[in-house]
Amino acid sequence: MSETEREDERWTPPIGPIDPEHPECAAVIAEVWTLLDGECTPETRDKLKQHLEECPTCLRHYGIEERVKRLIAAKCSGEKAPDSLRERLRIQISRTTIIRG
């Protein structure tokens, strides 16, 4: 097992503001999927990217989510989730992040 794989096994997703210098981490993590899916506004995209450039923990979380997205795309290509399901999932992810934060 490589060092990166061992680090991934030990890593747990950030919950809430984890860095006093970056109190917006919980909101960024809640919106990572909108950035990955290209579903955020240009203004939100710029804010998220700026935060990711400044916050190594959120950048790491983003990288893991990006890998998950690629894996799902490779295994489930061709089918798109209905809009209603995507919206319910987005709301649930936001609620989970807010509750934990």
Swiss-Prot record:
PTM entry text: Phosphorylated, probably by PknB. Phosphorylation decreases interaction with SigH, probably leading to increased SigH-mediated transcription.
Plastid recorded as keyword: no
Induction: Induced after heat shock (50 degress Celsius). Part of the sigH-rshA operon.
UniProt-annotated stretches for the region Disordered: 1-20
Signal peptide: none
Family, similarity comment: Belongs to the zinc-associated anti-sigma factor (ZAS) superfamily.
Protein name per Swiss-Prot or TrEMBL: Anti-sigma factor RshA
Quaternary context: Interacts with cognate ECF RNA polymerase sigma factor SigH under reducing conditions; the complex is disrupted under oxiding conditions or as temperatures rise. Binding inhibits the interaction of SigH with the RNA polymerase catalytic core.
Needed co-factor(s): iron-sulfur cluster
Annotated function: A redox-regulated anti-sigma factor for cognate extracytoplasmic function (ECF) sigma factor SigH. ECF sigma factors are held in an inactive form by an anti-sigma factor. Overexpression leads to increased susceptibility to diamide.
Entry binding sites for iron-sulfur cluster: 25, 51, 55, 58
PTM-bearing positions, type Phosphothreonine: 96
Molecular functions per Gene Ontology: iron-sulfur cluster binding; metal ion binding
The organism's place on the tree of life at top rank: Bacteria
Keywords: Iron, Iron-sulfur, Metal-binding, Phosphoprotein, Transcription, Transcription regulation
Co-factor binding details: Binds 1 iron-sulfur cluster per subunit.
